[in-house]
């Protein structure tokens, strides 16, 4: 299956109704009945903040697995799938788990788990199990708190794609990105945020701000822009400001 067949499994981990076990299932989304043999890690988070790491092993012909929990899960518990980031597949989230995972991103100290959650949440956005508005709101709360450069870059890309794919109101996104451009401690984060801001800016205020910046050739403090950045900015401005397009192109 791993080498010779296309696609990947759809995996879901659900706490049983009695709260005593975690039920993990896999299925072939292409309807061929294929099963993937692999070891998976799930993190059950309890209302008091305690966690339980649940290891699941799928055999060659195994579509589901039931693992008994050490503690009985109650209302408020949720599941973080693929906790070690080693699993292969689309980890479908229940609505309550998706909301909880999004809300817990800023407080998650484990960088591997945080990176895995970013991928899982983004894939659930693309598969429309998470509303774009909910995803964007939570990610914008999380992004300014991320200090890991790789995770920041990944999250920034996911947020930009969400804006482009689902055409959300850009106002809060523009505000958060500009705040990072002007206030982030890491210069690389400032530059990355500026480039994303440039690509998604749609409001008259944001476009006007970029036009003034380009015209004066004056980058925000602590944000070093290259000649290519100004060239790319001129292209975006020419599209956003058609009445000034000829002037912008000629000047650049």
Where are these regions (language model features)?
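Non-catalytic accessory/interaction domains
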Residues: 1-252
């Amino acid at each position: 299956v791993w080498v010779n067949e296309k696609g990947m499994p759809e995996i879901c981990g659900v706490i049983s109704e009695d709260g005593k076990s975690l039920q993990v299932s896999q299925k072939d989304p292409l309807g061929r009945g294929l099963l993937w043999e692999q070891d998976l890690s799930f993190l059950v988070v309890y209302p008091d903040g305690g966690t339980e790491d649940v290891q699941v092993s799928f055999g060659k012909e195994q579509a589901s697995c039931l693992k008994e929990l050490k503690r009985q899960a109650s209302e408020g518990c949720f599941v973080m799938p693929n906790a070690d980031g080693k699993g292969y597949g689309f980890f479908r989230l229940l609505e309550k788990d998706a909301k909880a995972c999004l809300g817990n991103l800023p407080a998650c100290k484990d960088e591997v788990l945080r990176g895995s959650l970013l991928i899982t949440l983004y894939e659930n956005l693309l598969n429309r199990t998470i509303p774009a508005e909910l995803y964007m709101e939570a990610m914008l709360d999380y992004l300014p708190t991320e200090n890991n450069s790789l995770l920041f870059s990944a999250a920034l890309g996911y947020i930009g794609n969400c804006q482009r794919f689902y055409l959300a109101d850009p106002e809060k996104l523009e505000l958060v990105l500009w705040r990072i451009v002007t206030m982030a401690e890491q210069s690389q984060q400032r530059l990355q945020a500026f480039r994303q801001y440039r690509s998604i800016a749609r409001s008259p205020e944001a476009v006007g701000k970029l036009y003034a910046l380009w015209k004066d050739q004056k980058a925000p403090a602590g944000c070093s822009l290259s000649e290519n950045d100004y060239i790319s900015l001129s292209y975006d401005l020419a599209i956003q400001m058609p009445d000034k397009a000829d002037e912008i192109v000629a000047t650049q």
